[in-house]
Amino acid sequence: MREYAVFTSESVSEGHPDKMADQISDAILDAILKEDPYARVACETLVKTGAVVLAGEITTTANIDVEAVVRQTVNGIGYHHSDLGFDGSTCAVINMIGKQSPEIAQGVDRQKPEDQGAGDQGLMFGYASRETDVLMPAPISYAHRLMERQAELRRSGALPWLRPDAKSQVTFAYENGKPVRLDAVVLSTQHDPEITQTQLKEAVIEEIIKPIIPAEMFHAATKFHINPTGMFVIGGPVGDCGLTGRKIIVDTYGGMARHGGGAFSGKDPSKVDRSAAYAGRYVAKNIVAAGLADKCEIQVSYAIGVAEPTSISINTFGTAKVSDELIIQLVREHFDLRPFGITRMLNLIQPMYKQTAAYGHFGREGSDTAFTWEKTDKVEALKDAAGL
């Protein structure tokens, strides 16, 4: 497979309307899981001028104040005043959530938890590479960090004219499959009307971009496109409608790896769209961290109501130190990829999903209760089994 000469990935801020929708959906999921760990949740959100619309299917014993969760989330993102075009305290909240079909439940639920079937058919991918210290592709990793930096400076008041909505796009040049220089950065950020474009561009380059991207990656021809359309005062849900699940490439690997098509936010762990994609990252990251390959993509697939994956495939892009067949064998031996096995292996029945809903689901610090799929606790077992 020919390597890319350049590669580009984008990210968006927590104040981007699609990410607002993701965070609201996951905040509702978290609130439900706090009271009912085994709830079935599929929560979709739409945000547009003055309104948040909720829809989906939820089956739970939890009794939560959905409207309060929505308002707290919107205000927490930074849309807390009408001057910003959206106010979490006064926006309309329209709730159209129903119950999950019993036909789905009968296909998923089992007497023995380990026999729990997949919540739907589908295919999911996981990926890892040695491009960065978090074993993620460089373009998406740095695009996320730029958006985190924008939010940090906005929240701290260091750049008080910043507003919540923003986007980044990063292009790296590659040689021999490794990023060697920064070709271009695009960064658009919502702002107060008083700031001049000259002030904004200087601040974005000096305070957001340069502290994040390593100095050695810049070169004389690096291009900076800062708010290239000029003014960006009208943003968030006023500028664009936001929907849950519309940033699936931002959420994963920035286009560097394939995607099965299923979104994450608003879905409980019984939905393999989410849990199996997390497991795929866990598997791929441990394979790369163990030195079995420098780059790894895994595909898993499921049938609704069936526990065992219908397929497991591995692609190491010619970087493996052992055969791909052996790696697949080790995956089957060391990782339980049944839906219940994934939930248990990664401790997924936790109210921790809202923090995944902005700045990427992968390549972030792992802990006992969040981003557990970033752990590399299978490394020694894989090394020993592979004879490395």
From Swiss-Prot:
Binds 2 divalent ions per subunit. L-methionine binds at residues 57, 100, 240, 271. K(+) binds at residue 44. Coiled coil: none annotated. This is S-adenosylmethionine synthase. Its EC number is 2.5.1.6. NCBIfam families: metK. GO terms for biological process: one-carbon metabolic process; S-adenosylmethionine biosynthetic process. One of its GO terms (cellular component) is cytoplasm. Keywords: ATP-binding, Cytoplasm, Magnesium, Metal-binding, Nucleotide-binding, One-carbon metabolism, Potassium, Transferase. The keyword Electron transport does not apply. It is found in: Cytoplasm. Its main location: cytoplasm. SUPFAM superfamilies: S-adenosylmethionine synthetase. One of its GO terms (molecular function) is magnesium ion binding. ATP binds at residues 16, 165-167, 240, 246-247, 263, 267. Catalyzes the formation of S-adenosylmethionine (AdoMet) from methionine and ATP. The overall synthetic reaction is composed of two sequential steps, AdoMet formation and the subsequent tripolyphosphate hydrolysis which occurs prior to release of AdoMet from the enzyme. Residues 100-110 are annotated as: Flexible loop. Transmembrane segments: none annotated. The keyword Nucleus does not apply. Belongs to the AdoMet synthase family. Its cofactor is Mg(2+); K(+). Pathway: Amino-acid biosynthesis; S-adenosyl-L-methionine biosynthesis; S-adenosyl-L-methionine from L-methionine: step 1/1.
